[in-house]
UniProtKB/Swiss-Prot annotation:
Gene3D superfamilies listed in its UniProt record: 1.10.1760.20
Keywords: Cell membrane, Cobalamin biosynthesis, Cobalt, Cobalt transport, Ion transport, Membrane, Transmembrane, Transmembrane helix, Transport
Protein source organism: Methanosphaerula palustris (strain ATCC BAA-1556 / DSM 19958 / E1-9c)
Chief location category: membrane
Location(s), subcellular: Cell membrane
Similarity comment: Belongs to the CbiM family.
Stored InterPro entries: CbiM, CbiM/NikMN
Protein name per the record: Putative cobalt transport protein CbiM 1
Cellular component aspect of the GO annotation: ATP-binding cassette (ABC) transporter complex
Length: 231
C-alpha cells in the first residue's frame, strides 16, 4: 500500500497532504488530551504503534509503485479511535520512509490518508456499529481489523487510478486493475491480520481489562464474557 517516493505527480502529493492535515491536527489534539487525562494508556498506545510499525513493514510485491502488507491500524482504531490512530500511523510512515525506504516523504500525505485515516475510520465505524447491535466482541474486533486493512487498499487503488487513469477506460478501468492486483494478496493478509489482532485484543482484556473499560471499548459485562468464553 505504501506508494513509493516520487511516484505520484506533484499536484496529487500536495492534494493528499492538504486532505490529511486536518485529521492529523485533530488527532494530535485528542492524543494530548488523552495522555493528560490518563497516563496509564501510554503503554497501550505504544503497543498499538508497534503493531502498525511491525505489520506494515512486512511488505510483499504488488502493483508498480506500491506493495502489499498488513496495516495493523485496526487495533488502534478500536482502542483509541481513528484520529489518534492517524497520528500513530504518520509517525510510523515517516520512520519507514526515512530509514527503511518504505513509502516516501513526497507520498506521505497519500499514504497517511489511506492507511492512517481511511482504514482506521472504517474499522472504527464497523466496531461501533457492531457494538450497537450487540455483536460478539471477538467477531466485532476481527471484522473491524480485517475491513480496515482491505479498505486501506481500496483507497490506495483510488489514489493510483486518479493519478494514472488508463488510456482506454479511464479512472474506472485503472481502479479495477489496481484493486484486482491488490486483492490477490490483500484478502488473505486481511484475514490473517484480523485473527492476529483478535488474539491480541483477548490478551489485553486478560491483563488490563480496566483500560479497555475506561476507554469505552468494551463494557464490564463484555469483558467478563470474553474471559469466560475463551478461558
Amino acid at each position: 500500500m505504501h506508494i513509493m517516493e516520487g511516484f505520484l505527480p506533484l499536484q496529487w502529493c500536495l492534494f493528499w497532504f492538504a486532505v490529511s492535515a486536518p485529521f492529523i491536527a485533530y488527532g494530535i489534539y485528542q492524543l494530548n488530551r488523552l495522555v493528560k487525562e490518563n497516563r496509564s494508556t501510554l503503554p497501550l498506545l505504544a503497543v498499538c504503534g508497534a503493531f502498525i510499525f511491525v505489520l506494515s513493514s512486512l511488505k510483499m510485491p504488488s502493483v508498480t509503485g506500491s506493495c502489499s502488507h498488513p496495516t495493523g491500524t485496526g487495533l488502534g482504531a478500536i482502542m483509541f479511535g481513528p484520529f489518534i490512530t492517524s497520528v500513530l500511523s504518520i509517525i510510523v510512515l515517516v520512520y519507514q520512509a526515512l530509514f527503511l525506504a518504505h513509502g516516501g516523504l513526497t507520498t506521505l500525505g497519500a499514504n497517511v490518508f489511506s492507511m492512517g485515516i481511511c482504514g482506521p475510520l472504517l474499522g472504527y465505524w464497523v466496531y461501533q456499529g457492531g457494538k450497537a447491535i450487540n455483536l460478539n466482541s471477538i467477531v466485532n474486533v476481527f471484522l473491524a481489523s480485517a475491513l480496515a486493512d482491505i479498505f486501506t487498499y481500496v483507497i490506495t487503488s483510488i489514489q493510483l487510478s486518479l493519478a494514472f487513469p488508463a488510456a482506454a477506460g479511464g479512472y474506472m478501468t485503472s481502479f479495477i486493475t489496481f484493486a484486482g492486483i491488490f486483492a490477490v494478496t490483500q484478502v488473505p493478509l486481511a484475514i490473517i491480520e484480523g485473527i492476529f489482532l483478535t488474539l491480541t485484543f483477548k490478551y489485553i482484556n486478560q491483563i488490563r481489562p480496566d483500560i479497555l473499560i475506561h476507554l469505552g471499548v468494551i463494557s464490564p459485562a463484555q469483558s467478563k464474557q470474553i474471559l469466560e468464553a475463551y478461558s
